[in-house]
From Swiss-Prot:
Primary location: membrane
Domain of life: Bacteria
Localization in the cell: Cell membrane
Enzyme class: transferase
Descriptive protein name: Phospho-N-acetylmuramoyl-pentapeptide-transferase
Enzyme Commission number(s) from the entry: 2.7.8.13
Gene that produces this protein: mraY
Pathway membership: Cell wall biogenesis; peptidoglycan biosynthesis
Membrane topology: Multi-pass membrane protein
Keywords, ordered alphabetically: Cell cycle, Cell division, Cell membrane, Cell shape, Cell wall biogenesis/degradation, Magnesium, Membrane, Metal-binding, Peptidoglycan synthesis, Transferase, Transmembrane, Transmembrane helix
GO cellular component, one term: plasma membrane
TM segment ranges: 6-26, 54-74, 78-98, 124-144, 150-170, 175-195, 201-221, 227-247, 252-272, 302-322
GO BP term (any one): cell division
Upper lineage: Bacteria, Bacillati, Bacillota, Bacilli, Lactobacillales
Reactions that this protein is recorded to catalyse: UDP-N-acetyl-alpha-D-muramoyl-L-alanyl-gamma-D-glutamyl-L-lysyl-D-alanyl-D-alanine + di-trans,octa-cis-undecaprenyl phosphate = Mur2Ac(oyl-L-Ala-gamma-D-Glu-L-Lys-D-Ala-D-Ala)-di-trans,octa-cis-undecaprenyl diphosphate + UMP
Length: 322
């Protein structure tokens, strides 16, 4: 299949499926009068979002899964690499589904315990490494033009840290309408370009499909959001993004490409550390997007600013990689 068609066709199909089924999902939640419970310690004006349909990740994850499998078969790109990335999306999405379901059933903002999420994420990372070894892919990191060979044990620990860390980083970023959807589109587009230049058309197929699904989802997720992606969406996207970075062998570039996710996570770590050590907070609220909200920024202003940061950082990364 022509490389451009490989990008456009799955993206369009994922977009159409998402646009068709998200409104049905929204209608289902509204009829049942179920929706997201908003945490009380967040910005007070977020309380008006309480009851907004959630678990939108269920729709776009299914769209991604269906399109990847169909086009993987049609284009003969259904290789182990594509399957393991898709598996990470599904497994981490399932953890998010479980988490979101508990919140809905118990009508609270707390779902799975931290250790339960962590255990599931670690299992996914171990299976990812197993496929890596089976496919005889390099157990090393690309570092300033050099290969840093880690070996099986260190690479396994790194993969666990990377997959767990970025799935949670994306989850932390999902605090205002549309932010993660837009940022994930930018990140997957960047890695799609990298995969294209590497000739990894299976990874390119996955990235294109995710972009199409998220373009369909953001129509309903931008401010004011008609639906949230929930943990099912954010954990899945974060895990899949980390997996793609490992498969393209440009893992550390994700620190730049996904700088917004790193910044959000760092703001939480700094806030907690500062409060425990000094009793004072660095930010008005964390993650940092809430700090800007407390400073009077609108959600749209935060979205556009953070997306621009993401685009600039991705352009810098591509300039060094390509």
């Amino acid at each position: 299949m022509n490389s451009m068609l490989l990008i456009i066709a799955p993206a369009v199909c994922a977009f159409i499926l998402t646009v068709i089924f998200v409104p049905m999902f929204i209608s289902y939640f509204r009829k049942r009068k179920e929706g997201q419970m908003i945490r009380e310690e967040g910005p007070k004006w977020h309380q008006k979002k309480s009851g907004t349909p959630t678990m939108g990740g269920f729709v776009f994850n299914l769209a991604i899964l269906a399109v990847v499998l169909v086009f993987g078969l049609l284009t003969k790109n259904l290789h182990a690499k594509l399957l393991i990335i898709t598996f990470i999306l599904v497994l981490y999405g399932f953890l998010g589904f479980w988490d979101d379901s508990i919140k809905l059933w118990k009508k609270q903002n707390e779902g799975l315990k931290a250790w339960q999420k962590f255990l599931g994420q670690v299992v996914g990372a171990l299976l990812f490494v197993f496929v890596f070894v089976h496919e005889k892919l390099p157990l090393s990191l690309a570092l300033f033009g050099h290969e840093l060979h880690l070996g099986l044990v260190l690479y396994t620990l790194f993969a666990i840290f990377w997959l767990v860390g970025f799935s949670n980083a994306v989850n932390l970023t999902d605090g205002i309408d549309g932010l993660v959807s837009g940022q994930a589109i930018i990140a997957f587009a960047t890695y799609g370009i990298i995969a294209y230049y590497q000739g990894q058309f299976d990874v390119l197929l996955f990235c294109a499909t995710v972009i199409g699904a998220l373009l369909g989802f953001i129509i309903f997720n931008h401010k004011p959001a008609k639906i949230f992606m929930g943990d099912m969406g954010s954990l899945a996207l974060g895990g899949a993004l980390a997996a793609v970075s490992l498969m393209t062998h440009h893992e550390l570039a994700l620190l730049v490409i996904g700088f917004v996710f790193v910044m959000e996570t760092a703001s939480v770590i700094l806030q907690v550390a500062s409060f425990k050590l000094t009793g004072k907070r660095i930010f008005k609220m964390s993650p940092i997007h809430h700090h800007f909200e407390m400073c009077g920024w609108s959600e749209w202003r935060i979205d556009i600013t953070f997306w621009c940061i993401g685009i600039i950082c991705s352009a810098i990364a591509l300039a060094f990689i390509l």
